[in-house]
Structure formats: C-alpha cells, structure tokens
Amino acid sequence: MAMDDKVLKKREEIQEQDKWSINEIYSNDEVWEKEYKELQEEAPKLKEFEGKLGDGETLIRYFEVNEKVSRKAEKIYVYAHLRCDEDTSNTKYQAMMNKIDAYMAEYATYTAYVVPEILSLPDGTIEKQMEELKGLEPYKFLLENILKEKPHVL
C-alpha cells in the first residue's frame, strides 16, 4: 500500500456522490440561522407550562409543543455538527456547532421542571388522566417510566 493512500483528502477532492447530502437538511446556512433564531423564540415557551402539568389537557399541550420544538432543535444540532465534521478546520462551522451546543444547555433549563413536577403530583393523578384522555396515549410509555421513579424520590 502506497503512502499516498493514507493521506486524508480535502473535501473538495472527494467525489460528490461520496459526500453527505447535508443540503437536504437545510438548503443553506441562512436557512439554518433563521431556524436557530426561531428556536430561540419558541423554546422558552416551554417554561409556560411549569406548575400546570397536573392538568391532563395542559400536559398534552406541553408534550405537543415540546415535540415540535425538540425536533427543530435536533435538526439544527445535527446540521451544525455534520457541517463541522465535513471539515473540522472550518471555523465558520466550528462556531455554528459551538453556538448550538451552548444553546442546547440553555434549552435543557426550559424543561428541567417536567419530571420533578410530574413526580410531585398526588399518587394516581397521571394514571387517571391516562385513562381519561386519549391524547396522552402517545406519551404513555414516557409517563410510565417517569412514574417508576416515584418510589425512589424523597
């Protein structure tokens, strides 16, 4: 095996069919930036549900909003990381990756109350709501896993 075979090629030297098609995630960086700004506006709204999760309809709305926002956050995160992985020396994409990484830590603070709040509800509250509200069905597994922790929480 020749020594040249072990030299890492630059991205522009790689054939197009052998590259990730990241533009299917976002057509360009400006679209990414627009969605990032939208995420910064939408994510804090998750805090509006704090103290209200004992109401089943509110819990359903929380899960729906959280799902929408978290999918957007994941898409933004993946795009930035894949762009950075294309060429780790590209400072523009390093900055994008660092930007979303830092924001994801902030994002986590908007939902940090959810599990403790659910666990603090009176026994049987969530179970009763799951029986009465079909809208909680998609979240049954998640809620049951949270409730399994209740005996271990002071």
Predicted ranges, named:
Residues 1-154:
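A well-structured
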